[in-house]
């Protein structure tokens, strides 16, 4: 099933998303494109801040709040990443990462339609990212005419397209691989471990079954050798 969804995503990308992103890159100069990316990232900062707190990362929460205030004011509603220039780099946090720090396991690997690689925990986390986002909830309170679901979906779609634009060359290289599904899965697991452990993932422990297989392979190889004749 995952491979089928992956192939669906690849065809959709080739037929729709890649041509659209190519036109966007050709027509829109780099500076405005970067501005869009900056604004979308800045709108995610309140949710990053909440997840920092939920993970009891108070220092990172303070940095996130400071970055949001600076970029929203001096950076003109997030158009410019002024925080980078004053030494407050961006970091990513989402509810999937929060669940991981609470001890919730990965769950099965999933490939979601249009969204790409995920797992059971992160799929639930993605739903929380959409429905509990404080910016969308605040806008809904300010103007009741705005439909919360429509607003959240629109933002999610813009963020997904912006990600496709930023990964334009990377995705082209991925689809040239002999088995892009396996490569995408491996990259996903590595990236999520990197994010969950704030850039310092522990060394993976060797699986006991892998150890037993290696030992059995060594025994089989030894038994297959002809006995030395005196």
Place the predicted regions along the sequence by residue.
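Mature N-terminal segment immediately following signal peptide/propeptide cleavage
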Residues: 1-11
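Amphipathic, soluble alpha-helical interaction motifs
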Residues: 11, 49-53, 187
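Beta-rich strand-turn-strand
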Residues: 37-39
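A structured, mid-to-C-terminal "fold-capping" secondary-structure block
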Residues: 103-230
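A small/polar active-site loop signature that marks catalytic segments
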Residues: 34
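Mid-length scaffold segments of soluble, non-membrane domains
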Residues: 42-120
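Acidic/histidine-rich, surface-exposed loop or edge segments in extracytoplasmic proteins
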Residues: 1-3, 18-22, 48
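Membrane interface segments of multi-pass transport proteins and intramembrane proteases
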Residues: 15-31
